[in-house]
A protein has these predicted regions:
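Substrate-binding cleft/loops of secretory-pathway carbohydrate-active enzymes
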Residues: 145-163, 230-256, 333-353
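Histidine/acidic residue-rich metal-binding segments in metalloenzymes
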Residues: 195-224, 237-254, 275-292, 304-320
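Bacterial N-terminal signal peptides
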Residues: 11-21
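Short, solvent-exposed beta-strand-terminating loops
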Residues: 77-83, 159-162, 260-279, 515-521
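Bacterial N-terminal signal peptides that target proteins for export
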Residues: 2-11
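A metal-dependent hydrolase metal-coordination microenvironment
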Residues: 27-237, 307, 328, 519-520, ...
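C-terminal functional module detector
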Residues: 26-38, 46, 50, 56-60, ...
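Short, structured patches in soluble enzyme cores that scaffold and shape functional sites
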Residues: 227-229, 262, 356
């Protein structure tokens, strides 16, 4: 039986801060003293199986070529008419398609529950054999009922069950899967039933995955929401803060984050943060006048929900929620072939600290998934950094990203230590066509951001607070430039900062960039990122060049509780 966050939550009283923190802290502990390793990954990428432009094997090869330690095949649910090489399913002899008959583009489609199980998974096994030092997960991009997209993956005790479990999830809960042929089918994961229309169905899906994880039907899983600003608010098919709170409440061990930095970073709108226009005063708004949202696109390649200090992400962290931030390529088609994308690992990476729990000298699928859930992760653009340690310490108590430090009373001297490293070069190549110049990846400054933790919000007792996507207590409390750090013999840059008399519960997170404050059309006077549309509008810088000019990294938070 898995250790259940959900069951602890049922016992804990929502009204008290400290019981809420205990409720949220259950599960893998980022503070464990076990030996581990930082591993780079990408878990959102597409092939010819769905709407990608290149073969399955090609995308796996690129993931390996750009040095990723792990990745997930994670492409759309529903139904598609071709395999991973672009061959139409209905040209196979004999025709292998199961389920209800449906056609797209003049060819019969195969429902994704079948292709994931019967065709994609065997290719994932081949990939694992071809790249034995890498880890290739079985995943898919869930079309979320009532909303947009989400990256999911499952790890099972018997690896062959990865595919059957994710097939059962897709069949039941993907809003684009119209097949009904498996209704009432008995599986190791329960009796299948279509539950794929409303937001409530999406919450049920998170609950289903949580139950499978708790009951041992699967070893591990993640549900991480993708390009979360692209469709705007929930009323227009996107997400509101209460949606994420609902998902996390239903599946605290599996639904634990989102992509703060969307893929498609070469696109004019840096990941479709929603299309926008900017006026002569630099005010950026949605390009469609009748759209009831205004996110202003991406800011330094990062969506509004994450980039806005005191915004939606901070609202969730202010509850003490273990809700973490990730980044991926969302590769479909490379920019040199007319697409909007970098290859997996070429530009954005999510770094996960995986712990070798069984001491075998390797890092398993389970250990990597546990690392993601721990929150001891960060993401970076363009290899701005390739190593980050972020710790808070009070005497002999210490916590890393995703972890918590609990003090019996006010902390007289909270020590914050940041250790980071940048490589000499990255993957930028000045080809004279798409990219005219490349700069070395070098951090200009790092912001230390903090906010108060006030406890979980009860949606029944505090309905207005539950839908509030802000945390007004969040602020930048310190900024560190090159004169603030020392470089050790290994080339690591080390920052030590002391915060005096901490008498309330708080969280701390980092962001860093290669850009100075007041960089025209990129940052404001204090270094906050500006809407990415400005530099295109005012200077004509766009595409891959814009992305390589404008590099950021974001850490995940440390939680400090004062009783």
């Amino acid at each position: 039986m898995k250790k259940s966050t959900k069951k602890l939550c049922a016992i804990a009283a929502l009204g008290t801060l400290f019981s809420s923190s205990l409720c949220l802290a259950a599960g893998p502990n980022a503070n464990a003293a076990s030996e581990g390793k930082w591993l780079s990954g990408d878990f959102h990428q597409h092939t010819l199986y769905t709407d990608g432009s290149t073969t399955f094997d090609f995308v796996m090869e690129k993931s390996n070529e750009f040095g990723l330690d792990w990745w997930a095949n994670s492409e759309h649910g529903g139904g598609r008419n071709r395999d991973g090489n672009g061959v139409f399913w209905d040209t196979y002899i004999p025709n292998p398609i199961l389920g209800n008959y449906a056609v797209s583009g003049g060819h019969q489609i195969m429902w994704r529950w079948q292709s994931l199980r019967d065709f994609v998974y065997p290719q994932i096994l081949d990939t694992r054999s071809l790249y034995p030092e890498r880890r290739a997960f079985s995943g898919f991009e869930w079309n979320v009922p009532g909303h947009e997209h989400c990256s999911t993956a499952i790890v099972a005790k018997d690896m062959a069950e990865d595919a059957s479990a994710i097939s059962a999830f897709e069949y039941q809960f993907d809003k684009s899967d119209k097949d009904t042929s498996r209704n009432s089918e008995n599986t190791p994961y329960g009796t299948l039933t279509k539950t794929n229309v409303t937001h409530a169905d999406a919450v049920t899906a998170c609950q289903w995955m949580q139950d499978q994880y708790e009951d041992g039907g699967i070893d591990n899983a993640w549900i991480i929401f993708a390009h979360i600003e692209r469709n705007g608010i929930a009323a227009t098919g996107g997400y509101d803060v209460n949606d994420f709170r609902d998902f996390n409440n239903a599946g605290p061990d599996v639904a634990f984050g989102f992509e703060g930095a969307p893929g498609h970073q070469v696109n004019t709108f840096r990941g479709f943060g929603n299309a926008l226009t900017c006026d002569e005063n630099g005010v950026c708004i949605s390009s469609e006048e009748d759209e009831p949202y205004d996110f202003g696109g991406t800011y330094g390649g990062v969506g509004y929900y994450t980039a806005e200090v005191g915004g939606l992400w901070d609202a969730m962290l202010g509850e003490g929620r273990r809700w973490f931030n990730f980044a991926n390529s969302d590769y479909h088609k490379h920019y040199t072939a007319g697409g909007d994308d970098f290859y997996p690992g070429e530009y954005q990476k999510t770094w996960v600290y995986a712990v070798d729990k069984d001491g075998d000298g390797a890092y398993s699928y389970n250990e990597i998934a546990d690392g993601m859930r721990s929150g001891n992760t960060y993401f970076a653009h363009g290899d701005l950094i390739t190593h980050l340690e972020f710790e808070a310490q009070d005497n002999n108590r210490k916590a890393s990203m995703g972890g918590e430090l609990v003090a019996d009373g006010a902390i007289k001297n909270l020590k914050i230590k940041i250790t980071f490293k940048s490589p000499e070069t990255n993957n930028c190549v000045a080809d004279g066509t798409y990219i005219s110049a490349c700069a070395e990846p070098k951090v200009h400054h790092i912001d230390l951001i903090a906010g108060d933790i006030t406890g979980l919000i009860d949606p029944e007792k505090e309905p207005e607070a539950y839908t509030d996507p802000t945390n007004p207590t969040t602020r930048v409390i310190a900024t560190f430039a090159a004169n603030s750090w020392e470089t050790d013999k290994n080339g690591n840059n080390v920052i030590v900062y002391h915060l005096k008399d901490v008498d309330k519960s708080m969280y701390f997170r980092l962001r860093g960039t290669n850009l100075a404050p007041n960089t025209p059309d990129e940052t404001d006077a204090v270094g906050n990122p500006l809407p990415d549309a400005l530099v295109t509008r005012n200077q004509g810088i766009d595409g891959a060049q814009e992305a390589w000019n404008d590099l950021w990294f974001y850490s995940n938070p440390i939680f400090v509780y004062v009783k």
